[in-house]
Design a protein with these regions (language model features):
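Charged/polar, solvent-exposed surface patches and flexible loops
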Residues: 2, 10, 35, 69-72, ...
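Short, contiguous alpha-helical
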Residues: 5-55, 101-156
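Helix-adjacent hinge/juxtasegments
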Residues: 43-88
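Acidic catalytic patch
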Residues: 87-102
């Protein structure tokens, strides 16, 4: 699928205007949440690599205008998320999680539920991106997660 920059930046009336705006928002949301998670436990050393990314000033910042740079950084950030998850333990998800939102308000919530929100936030906005791409006439193929889940081999 080929996309021109003018298509990526076209304001299509989405929450974050465009494909590039929405993809940047997903990235920014991930940085914000992962930075909060880093402060939750000293054992989350994978999250120390977050310092390489610029700190966003707002949820609609554009950190990347080049889709290739965004793609490269997205892959790196996803690898960081995978490493971070390997550092978590089941008991981590039962603990309280204290954080401040972007407006400075403090919250105490169950860490497991906050992590669920973290992943659901990505899913929500990725769904918007697939809609925007469809509106641009791009075929992105099947996006159902079930397609990528391998069949289990059971002995009967």
């Amino acid at each position: 699928m080929e996309l021109k920059y003018v298509e990526l930046e076209r304001n299509m009336g989405a929450f974050f205007d465009s494909v590039i705006g929405t993809l940047n928002h997903i990235f920014i949301g991930d940085i914000i949440w992962l930075s909060r998670f880093k402060d939750h436990s000293d054992k989350y050393t994978a999250l120390l690599s977050l310092e390489q990314y610029p700190a966003p000033n707002a949820l609609n910042d554009i950190l990347f205008t080049d889709i290739n740079d965004l793609w490269k950084s997205r892959i790196e950030l996803d690898e960081t998320i995978i490493r971070w998850l390997s550092e978590t333990g089941e008991s981590d998800f039962q603990k309280d999680f204290l954080y401040e939102n972007t407006k400075g308000l403090e919250f105490r919530k169950n860490f497991g539920e906050v992590v669920s929100h973290f992943f659901n936030h990505q899913t929500h906005h990725r769904g918007q991106v697939s809609t925007l791409l469809k509106q641009l006439g791009k075929d992105i193929g099947v996006t159902d997660l079930i397609v990528d889940i391998p069949d289990s081999q059971r002995s009967t």
